[in-house]
A protein has these predicted regions:
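N-terminal helix-turn-helix
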Residues: 1-72, 208-209
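Amphipathic alpha-helical effector-binding/dimerization core
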Residues: 59-144
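Short, basic/aromatic recognition patches
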Residues: 77-88, 135-165, 201-209
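Sensor-regulatory modules in signal-transduction proteins
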Residues: 167-170
Length: 219
């Protein structure tokens, strides 16, 4: 039982941090010998709960994120997103998505409303997406244009265009992103501007529903 508790403690530490943690950092935070932490991490890595990153540290693995995905479905952002995604898909004719930050370098899709077109963007629910190469990732990082949205064409996946805008929480921080994705051949430059306005509108409504401060609000 002690080993199980220690493993849970390590997963909790990784889940609380958006930055990858080194072996020594985890050992120090958990107050455990480095050898013990190394052994536990090896087991957790084999099970998919932990993954190594390029810099040599450790981060939450896919299975841990999937469990988190299941848990977050009971939270308000997931629940209130349904109407916004439905409207985005209906008004654009394309797939609408809700994404959140998974860790320091990735976003993850929590929910989608799929386009009615026979050819549409495939479901990426539960998939880790790099922040720097995706529209939702850039939106989550606050990197939007003067109109409040960001568009990416053929960056992560050839033939796919995405338009995203950030959703803000009660404290004003970015807590999620809404996006529209579809085949690049079907989304013109004019569509990008139109879809961008739609995403910004729905993101603002979602932010207000979450209690985000509005313009001029000093909260």
């Amino acid at each position: 039982m002690r080993a199980v508790q220690r493993a849970f403690d390590l997963l909790a530490l990784l889940g609380q941090s958006r930055e990858a943690a080194t072996l020594s950092e985890l050992a120090r935070a958990a107050a455990l010998p480095v050898s013990t932490v190394a052994r536990l991490l090896a087991t957790l890595e084999q099970s998919g709960f932990v993954r190594r990153v390029a810099a040599g540290g450790y981060a939450a693995g896919g299975r841990l994120l999937q469990i988190g995905l299941a848990a977050v479905q009971g939270l308000s952002i997931y629940e209130l997103s349904e109407a916004h995604l439905r409207r985005l898909s209906e008004r654009s004719g394309e797939t609408a998505n809700l994404a959140v930050r998974a860790d320091v370098g990735h976003a993850i899709y929590l929910r989608q409303t799929v386009s009615p077109h026979s050819i549409h963007h495939a479901s990426w629910l539960g998939r880790l997406l790099p922040l720097d190469r995706t529209a939702v990732g850039q939106a989550l990082a606050g990197r939007v244009d003067s109109k409040g949205f960001i568009a990416r064409r053929d960056t992560l996946e050839r033939g796919v265009t995405a338009i995203a805008a950030p959703v803000h929480g009660p404290g004003g921080d970015i807590v999620a992103a809404l996006s529209i994705t579809g085949p690049s051949y079907r989304i013109s430059d004019a569509d990008i501007d139109r879809f961008g306005a739609l995403v910004v509108e729905e993101a603002a409504l979602a932010s207000a529903a979450l209690g985000a401060p509005g313009p001029g609000d000093d909260r």
